[in-house]
UniProtKB/Swiss-Prot annotation:
The keyword Transcription regulation does not apply. Pathway: Amino-acid metabolism. Belongs to the peptidase M20 family. This is N-acetyl-L-cysteine deacetylase. Gene3D superfamilies: 3.30.70.360, Zn peptidases. Keywords: Cobalt, Hydrolase, Metal-binding, Zinc. Its EC number is 3.5.1.-. The gene is sndA. The keyword Transmembrane does not apply. It comes from Bacillus subtilis (strain 168).
Length: 416
């Protein structure tokens, strides 16, 4: 989508809600004007976009979300976390407890969209669409609150901080916000999927994320006298090549793994062999056994290559989110909801990006969707944008998904 589109809309909404006649709540006792709601959600998203905040620093974002919820009479839950908002919407009748989650943090990126509502915080941008996620969940919350009396169970809203830091979900779990919850639903915008389309897949959808840093210690020497030292540059070069054989020769070719060295640093001048070289990178996998296999081989290969060149290697390994694996039963119910919302459902290709929503799925069943937003640039790009007509559709999708799980006659798949 061209920047001309975004520049033209300014603060107005010259378009009609795409397919507004199919986004209807007329079967409910409390009908909602979705055209009005759409404009409200676009305004919310633009406010969030102008005032992005980094992981663990989402103080104004937290206050804004609380204000939006309190204005609708939605009950805020207590929390020991400094940022993030958690709330409940309980129906009149008993039933499962379902969580809906959106992440709220931004990235340390200087925005280059040229939008009239671009970030006002220098060097910080919602370049992964978490403003979209937050607005969409607020919209779903408003719809659920309007129809609270008809809910057959309870909805918990998780406005999660620090997803980009990789551990926000674990803090939410430690805070007890998943206690008593039977299933969890989330989504992520996808700029390469058209608006009106949702990607749903059982099993692995996003990769486990591991990060490594290896400091290779040698003995410095004059470049003209290499025999007087132990060259860590040679060792690092050999190690980088050898590490690639883990994927090509150790991992089953029917499985999937990525090992990338993204940084190498060593030496300060042209005629001196340095004492140390540091390499850093990441491993991505979709299977826990493969993840462990790659890690074990990584340490073994690093030790052996270093020893071969009389070097010492110090490895720091950071384990990030596990593979994100969607539950079959829950995903089936969410697929039903997507069809009811008149969305096109596709089977998406798994993404090698990571998502800490996976931590929730280690505790309770759930489903995570890719939601089409039709942008020109991928996540974390300084010109990243979303098509705002997707916001109301995402809200309605989350609303219908929550309702479908609550209304399901197959509650044994959700709760005991």
């Amino acid at each position: 989508m061209s920047l001309d589109y975004w520049r033209n809309i300014e603060g107005s909404y010259p378009y009609q809600t795409t397919g507004n006649d199919i986004l209807t709540l007329k079967e409910e006792s409390n009908p909602v004007n979705l055209s009005t709601l759409e404009k409200q959600l676009i305004g919310i998203r633009r406010h969030l976009h102008q005032y992005p905040e980094l992981s663990k620093e989402e103080f104004e974002t937290t206050a804004f979300i609380k204000k939006c919820l309190k204005e609708k009479g939605i009950q805020i839950r207590p929390t020991a976390l400094k940022t993030g908002v958690f709330a409940d919407i309980a129906g009149e009748s008993e039933g499962p407890a379902i969580a809906l989650r959106a992440d709220i943090d931004a990235l340390p990126i200087e925005e280059k969209t040229g939008l009239p509502y671009a970030s006002k915080h220098k060097g910080i941008m919602h370049a992964c669409g978490h403003d979209f996620h937050t607005a969409a969940l607020l919209g779903a919350a408003f719809l659920l609150k309007e129809n609270q009396d008809s809910l057959k169970g309870k909805i918990r809203l998780l406005f999660q901080p620090a997803e980009e830091a990789g551990a926000g979900a674990t803090k939410v779990i430690e805070d007890g916000q998943l206690d008593g919850i039977d299933a969890v639903i989330g989504l992520h915008n996808k700029p390469d999927i058209a608006v009106g389309t949702v990607g749903l897949k059982t099993g692995p959808l996003m990769a486990a994320v591991d990060r490594f840093k290896v400091e290779i210690e040698g003995k410095g020497a004059h470049a003209a006298l290499p025999h007087n030292g132990f060259d860590p540059i040679i060792g690092a070069s050999q190690l980088i090549v050898a590490l690639q054989t883990i994927v090509s020769r150790n991992v089953n070719p029917l499985q999937s793994a990525i090992l990338t060295v993204g940084k190498i640093n060593g030496g300060s001048t042209w005629n001196v062999i340095p004492d140390t070289v540091v390499i850093e990178g990441t491993v991505r996998t979709f299977d826990s056994e493969v993840r462990n296999q790659v890690k074990q081989r990584f340490f073994a290969v690093t030790e052996q290559i270093s020893a071969a060149f009389s070097l010492k290697a110090n490895v720091k390994w950071h384990s990030g989110p596990p593979p994100l694996c969607n539950d079959e039963a829950i995903t089936g119910l969410v697929r039903d909801a997507a069809h009811k919302a008149k969305l096109q459902v596709i089977d998406p290709a798994p993404s090698t990006a990571g998502e800490d929503f996976a931590y929730y799925l280690e505790h309770i069943p759930g489903s995570f969707a890719f939601f089409g937003t039709d942008g020109d640039h991928d996540w974390h790009h300084p010109a990243f944008t979303i098509d705002e007509t997707a916001i109301i559709k995402a809200s309605y999708f989350l609303y219908e998904s929550a309702k479908r799980l609550l209304d399901s006659n197959e509650e044994s798949k959700i709760s005991d």
